[in-house]
Amino acid sequence: MKFSIERAALLKAVSQAQSVVERRNTIPILANILLDAEGDTIRFRATDLDIEVIDRAPAKVDRAGGATVSAQLFHEIVRKLPDGALVAVEEDGAKGRVSIAAGRSRFELATLPKDDFPAMASEDFAATFTCPAPTLRRLFDKSRFAISTEETRYYLNGVYLHVAESDDGRVLRAVATDGHRLARVDAALPEGAEELPGVIVPRKAVVEIRKLLDDDEADITVSVSETKIRFATESAEAGTGITLTSKVIDGTFPDYARVIPAANPRKLEVDAAEFARAVDRVATVSSERSRAVKLSLDEDRLVLSVNAPDSGAAEEELAVAYADEKLEIGFNAKYLQEIAQQVDRENAVFMFNNAGDPTLMREGDDPTAIYVVMPMRV
């Protein structure tokens, strides 16, 4: 294997691929990245056995072939090379080394056998569809904050992506919950997604997928089976894009519809950004363990307060739109902030029942994104 490539293209491809590699590995080859040179393209492949990322970049290939090298070291070397450098990479099979040269810099990295590098098994996907990157970005960004980090409830450790019925017909829906808060986000159902099996996309995969979605003009091809989900950038078919394949969580997502309140009568309308900032301010004195903040609602008036015996107290009043009975209700400040930060519109609408029942929040009159948060005693 021998090729030369622009440093910027190499760094972009290696950065994306190596991000799935775990720093500590009991299987040595999983710490490596596979470089494969063929035609006028270099393919970079990395895996942790649950996620596989393949990135591609154009290069001048003098000799086809492949080798595996430490993902972390290779990435660090390329990152530290000067901007605009032309990087020459060459494998010496006899020595078991790969050399990296740019200008007056030269490095050698040890290799492990290419044939030992694991490949994710091929899959027959039940549904394949194309979706604009901004649509997928919205689905994941507005739901992933609610993913559970409790490993014993593994079936909550991801975003549940599925086809659902809404008042406007069938939609592509993303749901996440940790038992304390829930996010449900809808998007128009793409053509080809009708037979999509409901799958739970793991937290780490969501983080890696999100890196593919920053280009507003990009289209992403999504393929789903009962056990795997694949995301490919539009240019992947042309040999220069990224393909990410992940196993999905083998579990049953709970019946989330049961916890979404349907008829909470008390309505609060508040400036979302102002509300989030106020919660942040009063929570400064809350205890680290509970982070409790009390909402006291009266006619067109909201008082946020914290009373922490060990550290102090805080109170802030906001002008709001509220015309129902008085209500005092407590929440975890972090949960309120994270939900309020999802609001793209100016106003957030909270629907309450009483101090012990779940509260519903939505963005203005937009029904495509709703959030549920459980109260706590204060």
Regions found by a protein language model. Give the residues of each.
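Structural preference for solvent-exposed beta-strand-turn elements
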Residues: 1-378
